Amino acid sequence: MDTEPDFSIVTPSYNYASYVRECIESVKNQEGATFEHIIQDAGSTDGTLDILNSYPHLKLHVEKDSGMSEGINRGFRKARGKWVMWLNTDDRLLPGALAAVKAFADSRPDADIVHGAWTFIGPDGALQRPMKALPYSLNMHIWYGTYLASTALFLRRSTTIEEGFL
């Protein structure tokens, strides 16, 4: 019997052959947490599917969709992890990311959302600009809005289901 993984990483995909391998490797090499990696591909025609099929650990689903949000929601519906997040094909997780989120989430059983820092990556793959996660403040949210990068946003799956996905 399969046990519930700590995380379900959902990656919407469509014609991103030049980036998808780095995305997959960044998830595959995570340590300190259990995970499943669900790829929702909308029918890529640029070689992306050949790359995806070379990774037997992926849960690959190839289905036409009406856009990225539909692909993400389909992936969320298939997810079994305690926490879900989506990682676009041109994004990647830094080493130790899932272990750090797991440690924090385990220390805060009341949390339904965990958000952390992230770094912009240039077209050449170089890390460019680190962005820090700021403590939540209602005042800051009202006056400046709150930007939550999907690559650093983890949602409790049970809450995501109750609230109706994206």
Predicted regions span which residues?
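Short aromatic/hydrophobic "clamp" motif used to bind/position activated sugar donors
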Residues: 84
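Conserved donor NDP-sugar-binding/catalytic core segment of glycosyltransferases
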Residues: 96-128
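Short beta-strand/loop segment that forms part of the nucleotide-sugar
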Residues: 34-43, 61-64
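A conserved acidic beta->alpha catalytic loop
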Residues: 26, 41-50, 88
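Short, acidic, metal-binding catalytic loop of nucleotide-sugar glycosyltransferases
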Residues: 25-34
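N-proximal low-complexity "stem/linker" segments adjacent to membrane-targeting elements
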Residues: 1-26
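Glycine-rich, basic loop-to-helix element that forms the pyrophosphate-binding segment
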Residues: 63-79
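Conserved nucleotide-sugar donor-binding catalytic segment
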Residues: 10, 130-166
